[in-house]
Amino acid sequence: MCWRIGNGNHQTELYYRSATGNRDKIKLDINCLSRCHVYEPVVRDARNPFLPDDVFSVRMLSEYELFGAKLKALLERNTPRDIFDAYTMEQKGLYRVDESVSLIRKCIAYYLSLSRGVDIEQALESIRKRPIQDFKKQLFPMLKTGYGFVDRDLMTSEAVKCVSRFLSFTENETAYLEAAKTGEYRPDLLFEGDSAERIAENPAAKFYITKGA
C-alpha cells in the first residue's frame, strides 16, 4: 500500500477480489483540512446487507451538509454521477421545505468559498451539455442491472432544476462569498451559534480563503 500525499490530503487504494471474482478497489482519501463541519454529526443505524439482523450505529454528517457538498460538487465537476444524484433528489421530491432549502443553500455557499471558484451560469450550461457518451462510460455501468432506461435530457434538466432551487443566495450569503473572494473569512455572515463557532477556526478556510493568514 502506497500513500500519495498532497496539499492537506493523503490518498491510497486497496485492491481486493469481489464475490464474483472480479478485481476491484476501495479508494481511501483522508482530508486533513476539511475536519470542521458546519452542522452537528448525527448517529444512524446501518444494516449489514448480507446479515439482516446485524444492525450497528454509524456516526455521519448531517444530511443537509452531505447534500450541500454534493450539489457544490455538481457545480464544480458536472460529472454524470453528480448529475444523477441531483436528478434522483429532484425525482424523489427531497428538500422542498423552506428550512431545509436554507440549510443546504448555506452549505453550498460555504463549500463554494473553499473551492477554486465556480462560474455558476457556466456550470449549469455544462450540466445541460454533458455528452451522452460520458453517461454511457461513467454512469450506466454503475447502475443496478434492470434499472431501466435513463433519458439524458431529462436527467440533466432535472439536475439543473434541483440545484437551481438552492442558488438564490440571500444578501448575507452573497456578502460572505464576496468577502471570501477578497481573502476575508466571515462565517458569521452565514451562520450563528454552534455552527459559526464550529467552523470559526476551520483550517480549510485558512488554507483556501485567507491563505494561512
Regions inferred by a protein language model and the residue ranges of each:
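Structured mid-to-C-terminal alpha-helical surface segments
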Residues: 1-213
